[in-house]
Amino acid sequence: MRKAKKLLPFVLSLMLLSSCGAPASSASGYRQITMDEAAKMMKDEKNYIILDVRRPDEYADGHIPGAINVPNEEIGTKEIAELPDKSQLILVYCRSGRRSKEAAEKLVKLGYTSIAEFGGILDWKGEVLSED
């Protein structure tokens, strides 16, 4: 019994530390990934959508190549024609990361099953296109 009491803090510490390296995942069902992970997925995956959830004027000022624009404020208000396949991988970003998290949560509630949120374009190191 005494050995078990001495081992308990050690075992609990190991459990806590082992979860530190796990990929971030929201209780609401989407994954949070890093910019580097997003860039790798864009390079390696074939069937994905890059979703920019900023306002149209922000999107026009600069967006990731291939991204489609569905403003966060519109998600959940109507059917999203641009996202017909609810099982398709959707990589979500905004300006700083706040709206993309909100959008990812809404998409999960709408039944989308493969959502990866990677923050904001402010931290994006890859190519950015603008519509001048």
Which residues fall in each region the model found?
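Mature N-terminal segment immediately following signal peptide/propeptide cleavage
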Residues: 54
